Amino acid sequence: MAQLADGRPKDSGQMGLAARYYAGEIGTEFGAYLVNYHQRIPSLSLVKTPSGFDNSIFNGLAVAGQNVVNPLSYFFDYSQENIQVAGFSAATELFGYSVFGELSYTKDYPVSYNTVDLIKGSATGDGPLARYGDASQFPMGSVLQGYKPLDKIQAQVSTIALFPRRLGASQLAVVGELGAQMWRGIGDPLTGDRFGRSPAFGAGSH
């Protein structure tokens, strides 16, 4: 497949706002923030390249004069705009340990499809992303988006403890972290779209 120019978001519209408050009576700092930003980590997206377009070598096989594999080109896609994050944090000290936690909600984060499913579905019309191979929905020249905007809630708690003069060092730091994410719209990977799975494990069978 030929590589096309990267898909880029607009240059404007990114902003953030944060506030902090230290509650001295309980020795805890509280924080809150709001962020609106554009995609920073690219997804792999495809374009159905017309079969006579020479910059794609993925021109398919011909049977009875018809292509049985859709010709494709690819590009690195940074185009998701207005990813919104709202978060709340707290930091304190308990029993000599520094403890801090954060709870955040992210809206419209671009989650990449399994790349094997994406290419197979777009080229042959098979697998979880078979819709991308449907010429009635996605004719030649269509952009086949390699991600889906999804919402998530993330919570994490971390701690740091410092011990002077341990194990021959001037200071030993012990760090621990516990976190969890809950996504909305992921669905069942056995029957629907699949996200983030390594392409080394092949394509979906459904």
Segments from the language model and where they lie:
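Solvent-exposed loop segments that connect transmembrane elements
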Residues: 1-3, 42-75, 113-144, 185-205
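Transmembrane beta-strands of outer-membrane beta-barrel pores
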Residues: 23, 34-40, 94-96, 105-109, ...
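Residues on the lipid-exposed face of transmembrane beta-strands in outer-membrane beta-barrel proteins
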Residues: 17-21, 32, 88-92, 101, ...
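Substrate-recognition/cap regions that form aromatic- and gly/pro-loop-enriched pockets
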Residues: 150, 156-206
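Short loop/turn motifs that connect adjacent beta-strands in outer-membrane beta-barrel proteins
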Residues: 22-29, 93-96, 164-174
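Aromatic- and glycine-enriched pocket-lining scaffold segments that form the walls
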Residues: 1-42, 46, 88
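Residues that define the transmembrane beta-barrel architecture of outer-membrane proteins
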Residues: 11-15, 82-86, 149-155, 206
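Transmembrane beta-strands of outer-membrane beta-barrel proteins
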Residues: 28-30, 43, 99-101, 157, ...
